[in-house]
Regions:
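Extended alpha-solenoid helical-repeat scaffolds
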Residues: 1-691
């Protein structure tokens, strides 16, 4: 009996050790998901799939991390192979019910699994899940019965259902609709009743995801790819969908989730409405009245602090130029408010104003594209008509002279039409640019123009307007308005840079960094001289700000939007950051940069100088960074040239640490230069100037 007990104990001890080994292996196998070797990636996926069958808890982490492989680039068989294998794995894990299930039970099982994939998912994971479901829907892997079950979960009213499940259902349905908009078109009433009705008002996240699903009714370029016949007619502003979308932005609440709802509701309005600017003008006017009517009731007699902020009585025009009546007292800048409601209301108003401004410039761009598309179609039709006319004319009897005259006349007409067409298109583009640059924020009939000075004042006087949420909303609004007009951008750029440098709120600093990145794309000539301020945020004490800055700079540099001067060393420091995500991002950046015209080689000396001069970097960290960077210098010619440049520094080194740094880098380079080897072998010489 004792022997049996001992063996049992040993068995369980070994089993526990085995479980620990499997759990410890999970992070390592997660890393293999990012391997360049296709077979390693596929085997890692298989490991997580098999482990899930044995209910190994840690494998759920790997299964979720697998999702990002849906973005594996590949026109090659290798890239497609990884993507296809991922879809097959997920199909077996979540989309295949046991054989014993009836069709109804199987549909319930799959719908439940799909909903569970949204639980606790990060925004990045949801984006990857959307792409996965998009591809699966395109390949016909999602049965109609499963979609019907998802609508049942979302629309159920008689029995209690958890918020998570209802949200999960509409998230998944919105994702499937990227491949097939008909999924949501047929259930608009359900969405208005649930997501934009009482349930949505009680659960703002449900309302947000309902707005996203509604937006899918109008297919984007991705959804209309490969000759899809899906067409969408935009809705008039009195349509029930648009009325409900406008109403959901006006729900009285102090819940921070309201901002997500308002953003997606405005996105949906701009996707679905024939005249979104008119409807959004109404939303802004009503919100302005609500906010400033409350302010004037509390402080009826206090004058406004700045004359230039006042609006002419009874004239606060709309985005589209139609006048509206808003008393001047309501639109004057707010004074110090003790009322929490006023501050919340103003924060929400500024958020709406900023987001509408951004959506309006996107809307103008779409109008321009639509105009050009229709004009091209019209020109093609005219060309066809002329061609058929020419063919019928040439078939008639007539002398060669007459025919040539007709051809000359036709060619002349074609040239004239081309000239007129070109001018018309250019005129339209010029008009759009003028509206964006001069009308939206400076036009006498523009509603947004009333808010530009107010936002600047709130941001500039953060000691007066102390509320954290108000400052966050105002900075975001300022940044979005700056993306509309280069004139407004130039006037407020010093203010935004000051906010980015000095704001005590990391969220505000992060938003300012993203905004500067956007402006570098919109108005490159203004931002190019100020990129140093952006690089400084890489040394921000908050990891969130540092990470945001690194991602922003990665995009700008790789897309060629900013010129790299001598600041890449700041990004190289991030390779040794305490935050693993920042270090991984930096590695990814340099790996991508190395594919662009010897960029690492060209900037290595500048990076080396900056790193070597920074006494805060210890020797081991410095060596790891240099070893990583020199791994991208592969050509012998480049190695020799770098070695010569670095060797010239040996004689100028003032400290032994500096000399060691140079010697270490030279040791990594395959230069095959005996003179350099001799210099290094002699070691560091302390040269003292005579007294």
């Amino acid at each position: 009996a004792i022997e049996k007990l001992t063996l049992t104990k040993r068995y369980y001890t070994e089993a526990l050790k085995f479980i620990d080994v499997l759990h410890e292996a999970t992070p390592v196998i997660c890393q293999l998901l990012g391997s360049k070797n296709k077979s390693e990636v596929i085997e890692a996926m298989d490991y997580f799939e098999i482990g899930d069958a044995y209910n190994i808890e840690q494998n759920k982490i790997g299964i979720r991390k697998m999702l990002r492989l849906i973005w594996t680039k590949g026109s090659s068989d290798e890239g497609k192979g990884v993507q296809t294998h991922l879809i097959e794995c997920y199909k077996r894990l979540f989309f295949e019910a046991p054989d014993s299930f009836s069709p109804n039970d199987a549909a319930n099982y799959i719908a439940r699994n799909m909903i569970s994939l949204t639980f606790g998912a990060t925004p990045a994971e949801l984006t990857s899940l959307e792409q996965l479901l998009h591809l699966m829907m395109k390949q016909g892997m999602i049965p109609d019965l499963v979609i019907a079950k998802l609508w049942q979960v979302y629309g159920v009213q008689r029995r209690e259902i958890s918020k998570k499940q209802r949200r999960g259902a509409i998230i998944v349905l919105g994702m499937l609709a990227t491949a097939s908009p008909e999924i949501v078109v047929g259930e608009m009433e359900t969405m208005l009743r649930i997501g934009l009705g009482a349930h949505g008002r009680a659960d703002l996240q449900l309302a947000k995801y309902t707005c996203i699903a509604l937006r899918r009714i109008n297919p984007t370029s991705r959804q209309t790819e490969k000759g899809s016949t899906t067409t969408f007619s935009r809705l008039s502003n009195d349509h029930a969908v648009l009325v409900k979308l406008a109403a959901i932005t006006e729900v009285p609440t102090d819940n921070k989730e309201w901002y997500g709802v308002a953003e997606q509701a405005i996105n949906a309005i701009y996707a679905l409405s024939k005249h979104p600017d008119v409807l959004c003008s109404e939303i802004i006017r009503r919100k302005t009245r609500a906010v400033f009517a409350r302010s004037t009731q509390q402080e009826p007699s206090r004058p406004s602090s700045r004359d230039e902020m006042q609006i002419e009585p009874s004239q606060a025009p709309t985005l589209d130029g139609a006048d509206s009546t808003v008393p001047a007292s309501q639109a004057s800048p707010i004074k110090r408010q003790n009322s929490k409601e006023s501050v919340i209301g103003l924060s929400q108003l500024l958020f709406i104003v900023g987001h509408v401004a951004i959506k309006q410039i996107v809307h103008l761009e779409l109008c321009e594209l639509d105009f050009k598309r229709r004009k091209q179609e019209k020109d093609k039709e005219k060309a066809k008509d002329r061609h058929s006319l020419g063919a019928s004319t040439s078939s008639r009897r007539g002398g060669g002279q007459n025919k040539s005259k007709q051809q000359q006349q036709q060619e002349q007409e074609d040239n004239e039409l081309d000239m007129i067409g070109g001018t018309t298109e250019d005129d339209f583009t010029e008009a759009m640019a003028h509206i964006r640059e001069r009308e939206l924020l400076f036009g006498p009939q523009s509603l947004l123009a009333q808010f530009g000075p107010m936002v600047s004042e709130i941001c500039a006087n953060n000691t007066v307007y102390k509320d954290r949420n108000l400052q966050q909303a105002a900075t975001l609004c300022l940044a979005k308005l700056m993306c509309v007009s280069s004139e407004y951008c130039e006037a407020n750029l010093p203010l935004l840079i000051t906010i980015m440098e000095r704001s005590p709120d990391p969220t505000v600093r992060s938003n300012a960094v993203i905004a500067l990145g956007d402006m570098a794309v919109c108005f490159n000539h203004l931002i190019d001289e100020n990129t140093d301020f952006l690089y400084r945020r890489l040394a921000d004490p908050q990891p969130m700000v540092k990470r945001t800055c690194l991602m922003t700079l990665t995009f700008l540099i790789l897309a060629g939007q900013v010129k790299v001067k001598g600041q890449l060393g700041e990004m190289a420091k991030c390779l040794e950051d305490e935050d693993k995500r920042i270090a991984d991002l930096a590695r990814m950046f340099f790996t991508e940069l190395s594919t662009k015209d010897n960029a690492v080689y060209n900037h290595f000396v500048d990076m080396f100088s900056l790193l070597s001069a920074d006494e805060r970097i210890d020797e081991e960290a410095f060596r790891r960074i240099v070893r990583f960077l020199l791994g991208f210098v592969e050509k012998d010619k480049h190695a020799k040239q770098l070695a010569e440049k670095l060797a010239a520094r040996l004689a100028r080194c003032e400290t032994e640490r500096q000399w060691n740094d140079v010697a270490f880098a030279l040791g990594l380079l395959q230069h095959k230069n005996e003179e350099i080897n001799k210099l290094v072998a002699e070691g560091f010489k302390m040269v003292q100037a005579p007294a």
